[in-house]
Amino acid sequence: MSTPIIVMGAGGRMGSTICRLVQEEPQLCLAAVLERPDRASGVARDGCIAGSDPDVVFPQVPGGVIIDFTAPEASMATARAAARHGNAVVIGTTGFNEEQKAELAELARQIRLFWAPNMSVGVNVLLKVLPELVRLLGEKYDLEMVELHHNRKKDSPSGTALRLAECLAEARDWNLPDVACYHREGIIGERPQKEIGVQTIRGGDVVGVHTVYCLGPGERIEVTHQAHSRETFAQGALRAAAWLATQKPGKLYNMADIF
């Protein structure tokens, strides 16, 4: 039996990509699409429910898995509505503050809830191998990162960059807020050894590029992940949705739980 999928923001770039790919997966079916009231009629598709109110649509798809790549406040509203109606949720939105992350963790005790700032296979493999690389190199190597995205991205640094920076900090038993440097200007003196630089570039239509630099005496290692298409993230979300449908509530799941 196929898993019914509910797509939030179905008229957006990610939402429309997800809708298209769901229809190509035999184990999934597109059950409902949601958009803002002024755009809801434009996302209607044959054989699935279209609307704008989660409290109206979600109860019509019992057992449905919601996929949301919208914006922090909208995704929080989605998660709360899912908790009211018992639906599972896959969230790929970035830019959550600490209070919102804590609320997601609390909601995950009631419903099946999955959140990952980046759902590409490559990035999540990178998160697995980076700690070992950092440990092997030792603390004489400075750690820096540059992330590049399209000019319409609203949050900075990207959620992926922050997760990669957390990964680097954890490998050295550092607390990221204590060592992160997001801006350098003027006479700032020598670079502290206990620091992780995270720099941001915005422009054009770049889907996403993240480069981690390990800079040591006489050499450097650069590790780069480039996303060439939003399908990378959409495919990861579909994989997460199919997996989440078989899980139970109790924790805030992420890509590490799948790999």
Swiss-Prot record:
Protein name as catalogued: 4-hydroxy-tetrahydrodipicolinate reductase
The organism's taxonomic lineage, starting at the top: Bacteria, Pseudomonadati, Thermodesulfobacteriota, Desulfovibrionia, Desulfovibrionales
Pathway: Amino-acid biosynthesis; L-lysine biosynthesis via DAP pathway; (S)-tetrahydrodipicolinate from L-aspartate: step 4/4
Any one GO molecular-function label of the UniProt entry: oxidoreductase activity, acting on CH or CH2 groups, NAD or NADP as acceptor
Gene Ontology cellular-component terms listed: cytoplasm
Function (record text): Catalyzes the conversion of 4-hydroxy-tetrahydrodipicolinate (HTPA) to tetrahydrodipicolinate.
InterPro entries per the UniProt record, alphabetical: DapB_C, DapB_N, DHDPR_bac, NAD(P)-bd_dom_sf
Chain residues that bind NADP(+): 36
Highest rank taxon of the organism: Bacteria
Cited Pfam families: DapB_C, DapB_N
GO biological process: diaminopimelate biosynthetic process; lysine biosynthetic process via diaminopimelate
Localization terms from the record: Cytoplasm
Catalytic residues (UniProt): 149, 153
Family that this chain belongs to: Belongs to the DapB family.
Catalytic function, reaction form: (S)-2,3,4,5-tetrahydrodipicolinate + NAD(+) + H2O = (2S,4S)-4-hydroxy-2,3,4,5-tetrahydrodipicolinate + NADH + H(+); (S)-2,3,4,5-tetrahydrodipicolinate + NADP(+) + H2O = (2S,4S)-4-hydroxy-2,3,4,5-tetrahydrodipicolinate + NADPH + H(+)
Protein EC: 1.17.1.8
Organism of origin: Nitratidesulfovibrio vulgaris (strain ATCC 29579 / DSM 644 / CCUG 34227 / NCIMB 8303 / VKM B-1760 / Hildenborough)
